[in-house]
Every structure is written in C-alpha cells, then in structure tokens.
Amino acid sequence: MEERVAERLHGALGPLGFEVHAFKVGWYNAVLQPAFHLPYPDDTLAFVVLSTPSMFDKALKPFVNKERLKIIRDPVDQCVSHHLSSVKEIFPDQKVDVIFDYEILPSRRPKFLAQTAAHVAGAAYYYQRKDVKLDPWGEKKIFGVCIHPKYGGWFAIRGLLLFPDVQVPFLEQSAPVDCVSTEEKRTELLELFNFHWQDGRYRDIIEVKERYSEEQKTYFSTPPAERFRLLGLTRFTE
C-alpha cells in the first residue's frame, strides 16, 4: 500500500520540484516528548514533503502567474498549500490530513517538528549539538540543522501528508545519509548555521548537486514585504 501511495505522490509532486519521503508516525513520536507527538496510531503512514531548488521555477512562478488576479499574501506558503492540498484529489477514497510547516498550536508550539520528521523519514540528516563530541559553545544555545545529501542546505521542509486509514506495520525505516560525517565539519556546520546563517555558507557544507538560482537567492534574502515586486506583484494582488 505504501508503495502505491508513494508512487502517486511522486507522480503528482515530483514534477513540481517536491520530494516526498515515507515514515511511520511511531518513528517520529518515539524520539520526542509527548507534548510534541502526532495524535495518530504508531503504524499510521505519513510523508514529509521537501521543496528542492527547482520548485521555484516549476511550481512557484507558474502558481503566481495563474493566481495573479486573486489575493496573494504569501506566495510560497500559498503555492505549497495549493499543491499539497490538491493531493487529496488523487486519493478520493482515502482520508488525507495535511500539516504545513508554518502552522502552530494555541500553545504557540509548531504542529510538527519539521527537522525531526525529515530525519526519521530518511530525507535529510538532522545535525544537532549532541552530534559533536568536543562541544566548543559552553552556555550558548545551539540550534540543529538538516542537511540533504544532494542539496546540502538548499532545500526546505514544507509539510506532512498523513493517511489516518493506512496502517503500515511492516514499513522499514531508512536511515538518513550522514553526509557531514567528521567532527570538524559538524562543528563548522553548526557554527555557520547558528552565527552566520544569513550568508548561507552552511548550505554548502557539502558539495551539492543543485542550489538555488541567483534569482531565488535574491527572492529569499529580500524582506517578505518587498518580495512581491520581484514576482511582478503588488503588495496584495486584487
């Protein structure tokens, strides 16, 4: 069942520059405190959805051109929401729950921890402080970061697709590729991500197959309110 679902998802989202990776809810819940658990049985089939560098041209630009007569407040979020929600149409006989990376609970917690989901699904390795044996940071708070074996840091985790009626007790877990395997490189990665994230150098911690285009880099480095003009939009398209 998982293979049939995955095949349909790849067919629908792959040409738009998205990747999907399967996991069981239980794998995710097992590594988190109960407050962060997804409220589904352990064997429930889920997929984490990533956007790759090509999503900008394959999905975002066509979406903006098609929707430019409607109100657009956040082009990327609305594009991702449109395409992930459209997945329900290819599974008319299945219940599909969609959780987006920007959604939060009333408690202000995120609805899911994106990097944990990517790690347990084998999509991208989540490097954290505990992965560095000789910790040089003392009392400083250090955030972890996912690195994709093909795109390095040039990707984003966009959401989850959950299939509450599909149980996959025999799904085998794939470990993420440990592509930043040395102590020195892991330290450098966390240093760059935590203290120099704006220059984007952490994204190239490994040799990547594809990165954001110059146009895309400019778009994401521009303050959100000013991004509209880069896509030929006014602040709110009416």
Curated annotation (Swiss-Prot):
Its EC number is 2.5.1.151, 1.16.1.6. It is found in: Cytoplasm, Cytosol. Transmembrane segments: none annotated. The gene is MMACHC. Belongs to the MMACHC family. Can utilize both FAD and FMN. Cobalamin (vitamin B12) cytosolic chaperone that catalyzes the reductive decyanation of cyanocob(III)alamin (cyanocobalamin, CNCbl) to yield cob(II)alamin and cyanide, using FAD or FMN as cofactors and NADPH as cosubstrate. Cyanocobalamin constitutes the inactive form of vitamin B12 introduced from the diet, and is converted into the active cofactors methylcobalamin (MeCbl) involved in methionine biosynthesis, and 5'-deoxyadenosylcobalamin (AdoCbl) involved in the TCA cycle. Pfam families: MMACHC (PF16690). Keywords: Cobalamin, Cobalt, Cytoplasm, FAD, Flavoprotein, FMN, NADP, Oxidoreductase, Phosphoprotein, Transferase. This is Cyanocobalamin reductase / alkylcobalamin dealkylase. It comes from Gallus gallus. One of its GO terms (biological process) is demethylation. It catalyses: 2 cob(II)alamin-[cyanocobalamin reductase] + 2 hydrogen cyanide + NADP(+) = 2 cyanocob(III)alamin + 2 apo-[cyanocobalamin reductase] + NADPH + H(+); apo-[alkylcobalamin reductase] + an R-cob(III)alamin + glutathione = cob(I)alamin-[alkylcobalamin reductase] + an S-substituted glutathione + H(+); apo-[alkylcobalamin reductase] + methylcob(III)alamin + glutathione = S-methyl glutathione + cob(I)alamin-[alkylcobalamin reductase] + H(+); apo-[alkylcobalamin reductase] + adenosylcob(III)alamin + glutathione = S-adenosylglutathione + cob(I)alamin-[alkylcobalamin reductase] + H(+). The lineage of its organism: Eukaryota, Metazoa, Chordata, Craniata, Vertebrata. The keyword Transferase applies. GO terms for molecular function: cobalamin binding; cyanocobalamin reductase (cyanide-eliminating) (NADP+) activity; demethylase activity; FAD binding; glutathione binding; oxidoreductase activity; transferase activity. InterPro entries: MMACHC. The keyword Phosphoprotein applies.
